[in-house]
């Protein structure tokens, strides 16, 4: 082989590398400031993964309102001011579906083609079933389910607050949206289900990005839950009938099976996670904030007593009119969600977009952090304070939140179950504080800074002591 023959492939490789390097540098020059580390593919992932919430805010302070983080093979461009927010929520060049296809595949094994075929139809179905015109159908069943769980707590006790709200909301939600007694048939199966779902939920964010062989316990729990759905699909479909007598999951499966029967268990798992992952932590933070603020706690108790009386032994019914008289509780829930909002919402850039003086290239994940947006004093004065009264300014009668409140997403694809979640947490707070005298035995912990997806969990334990009112 001649020296020129040897030189040619080497030269081509070197020139190709130079072109790629120069292209990436040009991309970075035109685009926002980029934090990318030095390790291929991983990028800034090691530092970012330690405490992503803190990393995002430090980057914003250093680089300004638009910046990019390269981590785990992804370019994530964050925005924090009006122009960037408007692009994320309104631009035709960014897409929600493209942003979540890969995480949905990794966490539930739903292929992209199946997800694309069903996504808009299922979103419209859930939005209708759990929207403002239909939530009143859930008030009675949820109240009955919560009463049943409260009976099981007895007259007094001490529990971790997180376990307390899970004990109440997991069965109430499953029995209302899925099928009564579907999974939770006895103490052994209840304990196993709780443990498997907890493992799946806690590893969900990592499972959406990392190879499964790195997450063996999470992978086992995912397979266990999928097998549980596969075993019970027939029972779920046989429950109820068309219309409001059928459950939400039954209606979802009817739509899924117009496209495929193979992935019915997978969609069951997605709905399970969506139903159980965020409402319990919102209830945790709401009860925690109320009990940590004596004046607000007293106001809430006085409001409940003014509607239902002071005794705590009666099995009360809660009507739509009652809920309207107890706006203070909805304010407390929304203020808790404001303070403990998800770390990010995201869209995929499908065509380059201009934000301020930067061009964000196609392929980037465009991201906004509701957690930090809600701490901007320009939008929320005294942002770190728990001030339920700020929600007087929201037009909740017309289902309109405060400006720049993004806890449930924004734009076309907001959380379709947000009104159901608010309802079940309202009912939970009312029934707990009506029946029991409650107090916290530990300071309310800070939020975990390790996760960005969904409502943050507490970073530590917090016990609640409860005693039935005389």
Curated annotation (Swiss-Prot):
Its cofactor is heme. It is found in: Endoplasmic reticulum membrane; Microsome membrane. It catalyses: (24S)-hydroxycholesterol + reduced [NADPH--hemoprotein reductase] + O2 = (24S)-7alpha-dihydroxycholesterol + oxidized [NADPH--hemoprotein reductase] + H2O + H(+). The keyword Membrane applies. Pathway: Steroid metabolism; cholesterol degradation; Lipid metabolism; bile acid biosynthesis. GO terms for cellular component: endoplasmic reticulum membrane; intracellular membrane-bounded organelle. Its EC number is 1.14.14.26. It is a multi-pass membrane protein. The chain crosses the membrane at residues 3-23, 270-290. Liver specific. Hepatic expression is sexually dimorphic (female > male). Heme binds at residue 415. Belongs to the cytochrome P450 family. This is 24-hydroxycholesterol 7-alpha-hydroxylase. It comes from Mus musculus (Mouse). The gene is Cyp39a1.
């Amino acid at each position: 082989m001649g020296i020129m023959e040897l030189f040619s492939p080497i030269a081509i490789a070197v020139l190709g590398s130079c072109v790629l390097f120069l292209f990436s540098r040009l991309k970075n020059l035109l685009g926002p400031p980029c934090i990318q580390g030095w390790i291929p593919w991983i990028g800034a992932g090691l530092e970012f993964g330690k405490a992503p919430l803190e990393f995002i805010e430090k980057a914003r302070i250093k680089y300004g309102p638009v910046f990019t983080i390269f981590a785990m093979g992804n370019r994530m461009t964050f925005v924090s001011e009006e122009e960037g927010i408007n692009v994320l929520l309104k631009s035709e060049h960014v897409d929600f579906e493209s942003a979540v296809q890969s995480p949905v595949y990794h966490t539930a094994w739903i292929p992209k083609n199946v997800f694309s075929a069903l996504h808009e139809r299922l979103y419209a179905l859930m939005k209708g079933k759990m929207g403002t015109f239909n939530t009143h159908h859930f008030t009675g069943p949820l109240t009955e389910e919560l009463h049943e769980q409260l009976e099981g707590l007895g007259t007094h006790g001490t529990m971790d607050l997180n376990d307390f709200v899970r004990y109440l909301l997991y069965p109430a939600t499953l029995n209302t949206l899925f099928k009564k007694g579907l999974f939770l048939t006895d103490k052994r199966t209840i304990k196993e289900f709780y443990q498997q779902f907890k493992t799946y939920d806690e590893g969900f964010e990592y499972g959406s990005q990392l190879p499964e062989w790195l997450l063996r316990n999470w992978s086992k729990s995912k397979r266990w839950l999928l097998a549980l759905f596969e075993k019970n699909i027939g029972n779920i479909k046989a429950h109820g009938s068309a219309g409001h007598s059928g459950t939400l999951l039954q209606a979802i499966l009817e739509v899924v099976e117009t496209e495929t029967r193979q992935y019915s268990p997978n969609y069951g798992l997605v709905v399970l996670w969506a139903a159980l992952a965020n409402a319990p932590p919102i209830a945790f933070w709401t009860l925690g904030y109320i009990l940590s603020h004596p004046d607000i706690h007293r106001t809430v108790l006085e409001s409940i007593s003014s509607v239902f009386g002071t005794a705590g032994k009666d099995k009360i019914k809660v009507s739509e009119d009652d809920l309207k008289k107890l706006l203070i509780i909805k304010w407390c829930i929304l203020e808790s969600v404001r303070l403990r909002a998800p770390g990010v919402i995201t869209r995929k850039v499908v065509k380059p977009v201009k934000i301020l003086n930067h061009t964000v290239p196609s392929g980037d994940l465009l991201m906004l952090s509701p957690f930090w947006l809600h701490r901007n004093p320009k939008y929320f004065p005294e942002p770190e304070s728990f001030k339920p009264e700020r929600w007087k300014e929201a037009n909740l009668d017309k289902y309109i939140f405060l400006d720049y409140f993004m806890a449930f997403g924004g734009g076309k694809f907001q959380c379709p179950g947000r009104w159901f979640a608010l309802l079940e947490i309202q009912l939970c707070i009312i029934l707990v504080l009506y029946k029991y005298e409650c107090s916290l035995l530990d300071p309310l912990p800070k939020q975990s800074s390790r996760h960005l997806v969904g409502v943050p969990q507490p970073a530590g334990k917090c016990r609640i002591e409860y005693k039935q009112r005389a």
